[in-house]
């Protein structure tokens, strides 16, 4: 079929018009899209493009320092160097991993794993090793032409100038773990950073750590740094806050030396505000070990040593309190009206209950004793019989009222609650109807399933000193903000034990005075020449070895300032071992912080 010239022209005109129409349509779509991108969404896309072009480089702050109550530095900072590498450069140079692994003394496979696991883009540097020595830095500097993308940052590490370790109060730092990286996601932690693992370093991590700063660099399409962005001012890092502890470093040093190589703990509290003046747990550890790179051998020692040096025995370990807990039973019986302080029994050295003889620590017996004398001489038979009159339920209720079976709330965390057994507890552990009242006799003298922490016993001494008032134990006295130079005081929480009268406290306190100052007192080794001390000894039986030695007390008797607990694992007699240690600590405290009091104030006691 042939087209005429007119038909051909019509067809050409049609195609031309169609082409123009399609072109116009496509151009219109393009214009609309440009309008949408630049006018409607322009601001959003501009911000996104700037984010892609501008990168923020993190500037780490100096960690806050830690001082004792009088301003002596316990923890400071000193320079340390960390080696980093840019993943893109490592992948581009053959043999660089082998060379770098040799310099850093890290297996090559491990080095590759670090880079692969922690890189965030090809051009973001990854920390390979922290706290490298000067020999390593020198090699990297000398061989920098063969190590493209490898460099070092100046950071800081902890140092400990004090003679006192204060280990379990200060705690220690360690590299942030994968779990912690996930937990604190978005808070700026990266692989190789350090974080508080224990003590105030852990509890006050956010304050000590400070706030990151940032400087801004321009990067190209591949993410490589081109230049620093001068138009955008860098944000300076904000140093961490300094902590001033309640600890007195002189008393702490003495306490550490008195416990020496023995296992145990010692706590001294200010009864007027709950300040912890010293807290020792033995064995302890040298915190400076954790300031460096801890070796596998060192970590294995800390984790698997049978004496568990990282464990804070003052707040984490629980023990039977022995005769120190007789004070709780006395309070329960007196407040419930079950006895008066004149109620007496005759101690022959043992008490027959059912088919079993329950012994007193004094085999030939104490003779006739009332409550005052029973506390003074720590007569087991008296408290065996008193427990049967009082009952398990009352005994447990008053134990909980006085702070046992729950945490004290001390600000170093990782605290144990202890155990105050009641009927429900015994039913669940031994079966309903499978336990007998004989268990109550063991509980009466601080044995059996009853478990307490040394800090809980120090808190009991504070409660008795203050006639029921007590403060939350705490180790941080104030916080100092180095930028504004402002001090932030710590709020002190106080409480009053409910349901125990002033009269009952007075009776029990008088018994405690006799323990230290009476002719037959078991705690006479804690007595001071010019200051009246009140206390209670304990010798807790231990199924796994020798007895534990306990002493709790407070002083001065009439105007209490401090409460103390000394617990020596497998130490033997509380009166012979723990009480003399308490005396030396109290002596040092009153030497350093003297009080004007009348010489030992006599107390008129209704003792038969």
Predicted regions and their residues:
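Beta-lactam-recognizing serine transpeptidase/beta-lactamase-like catalytic domain environment
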Residues: 2-6, 10-13, 75, 220-234, ...
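Periplasmic/cell-envelope proteins involved in peptidoglycan metabolism and beta-lactam response
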Residues: 1-297, 306, 318, 338-343, ...
